[in-house]
Structure formats: structure tokens, C-alpha cells
Amino acid sequence: MQHPREENSIVVELEPSLATFIKQGFNNLVKWPLLNIGIVLSNTSTAVNEEWLTAVEHIPTMKIFYKHIHKILTREMGFLVYLKRSQSERDNYITLYDFDYYIIDKDTNSVTMVDKPTELKETLLHVFQEYRLKSSQTIELIAFSSGTVINEDIVSKLTFLDVEVFNREYNNVKTIIDPDFVSRSPFIVISPMGKLTFFVEVYSWFDFKSCFKDIIDFLEGALIANIHNHMIKVGDCDETVSSYNPESGMLFVNDLMTMNIVNFFGCNSRLESYHRFDMTKVDVELFIKALSDACKKILSASNRL
């Protein structure tokens, strides 16, 4: 029988500066939102609100919203989770299967429930204290993915809860919710000496290869866009930005993209340092082709899992 979760690694050998470029791009651009906009609506459990919200914030939601990876990474979509659970004599614990999961279309604020895998029943979140008929413990909470704008329109779509209670509790906590986009990388990625390695988790209930392709396609597109938008100052080097003086042939490297690209074409640069280098050796389109070829190689390696 296939195990519901397996740890694997995807490894490709690349030119070292290109491998570093992809690793750094992944860590900086592939951001999966956390559920940091949390509101407890009712809580008679022994765990305080902050404990519930911390536990929920880090639920591994990518394995639930796997059909929407690309639009979540581009922030066209967000998501929310909702839990309303009362302790009973027979059921004295909460698993991830007890939550309801919804995708949010940010253009329309539509809220759509998604199917949840039965395997989530195996992931324990909380155990109630001993059951007592006259003091049964309950918890009701909702948490939105980071970056979700809470307004009247989206609240009106939350037909599964008491809107008056939601508005009251949200107003109590909204000033302490981090307004910045809070996220994590889906995988750990390293690139020692050009050995680009993705440490991944594969689950039995969805096609990981398709999801991984969505992530790599997003990464490739974002990196190419950043390359096209990147500028190196031409003229006197002032040590505030990457700059090149064609008269002296001196290059000052002040950002990771410049460092990785010029190193790909033979420079041995480091951040915040000067190097004598002929910038006419740099062919941006050639670098982009190498990047695209590397992404194809990564996907080919993932297909062997």
C-alpha cells in the first residue's frame, strides 16, 4: 500500500552560478501564504486563543489547495479555513479533516469550498481534556491566507458563520494582525557546487508532478520577468547600485542577480566588490535560454519520482 506521505529529493547538476540563481530566485519569489489572519469566534477549550491561532497559521495548506497553486503564487487567489467543533464523549480530538477549506477569488471575492482528502484525519491538531457533559468544550475560528483584504463584500460571502460575531471579534484583533505578506517556501532548496536540490514531500492523494510543474513554471516566468526589468548603471561606480564603467572596465556588484549573471559568463564576482570584467561577454538571451533549459531539466528529474 502506498504511504500517504513520502520525503523525496529532486537533484540536477547545473552550472554553479545558474544553480545559485535558481535557488535564490525560489527562496525570494516562491512564497506560499500562511494563515496569519486568524479570528477566534468562540472558545471554551483549555487552549487560549493565541495557541489556536499559532497552530492554525502553519497548517500545511499546499497539500489541500494543490489544484490552485499557480493562482495562489501569483496572488490571484487566496484561501481560508473554518473550524466549528464541539467536544463529545466519542470524539475528543480535532484533526485537519474537521476544518472546512475555501478558495477565494480575489477579483470577485467569491468563496468556494474545496474537497478535503480523507487522509487529513490522520493529522492531529488538538486533544480536548476529559469530557464532561455539563462543560463540553467548543472552538470556532476562521483564518485567512496572508494578503487577503477583509471587507464588507468578502464578509457577506461567509454565509456559514454569524457575521455579527465575526465583525465584533475581527474588530477586536485587526490592529494586531501583521499587515505584511507572511509566507513560507514550499520546499527547502540548496545548490552546493551546482548540485541544485529540492527537498519535497509527496502525498498519495494528488499528482505531485503536476503541482511541482506549476511551481517551476511560475518560478521561471518570474525570474525571466526580473531579468528583463533588471538594470545596471553605466558610468561612474558609486557603490549604491550595481554599475559598470566601460572606460575603465570596472564592474561594481551590488545585487545577487548581477552577481549570478556575470559569473555565468566567466566573472568571479562577490557582492559589494569591484571586478575588472568585459560586460560585452554578457548575453542576456543566452542566459535566459540556459535558465529555461535548466527548468526543463528540473521537471524531467521530478518525473522520475
From Swiss-Prot:
Keywords: DNA-directed RNA polymerase, Nucleotidyltransferase, Transcription, Transferase, Virion. Coiled coil: none annotated. The DNA-dependent RNA polymerase used for intermediate and late genes expression consists of eight subunits 147 kDa, 133 kDa, 35 kDa, 30 kDa, 22 kDa, 19 kDa, 18 kDa and 7 kDa totalling more than 500 kDa in mass. The same holoenzyme, with the addition of the transcription-specificity factor RAP94, is used for early gene expression. Pfam families: Pox_RNA_pol_35. The lineage of its organism: Viruses, Varidnaviria, Bamfordvirae, Nucleocytoviricota, Pokkesviricetes. The keyword Cell wall biogenesis/degradation does not apply. One of its GO terms (cellular component) is DNA-directed RNA polymerase complex. It catalyses: RNA(n) + a ribonucleoside 5'-triphosphate = RNA(n+1) + diphosphate. One of its GO terms (biological process) is viral transcription. It is found in: Virion. This is DNA-directed RNA polymerase 35 kDa subunit. Its EC number is 2.7.7.6. Its main location: virion.
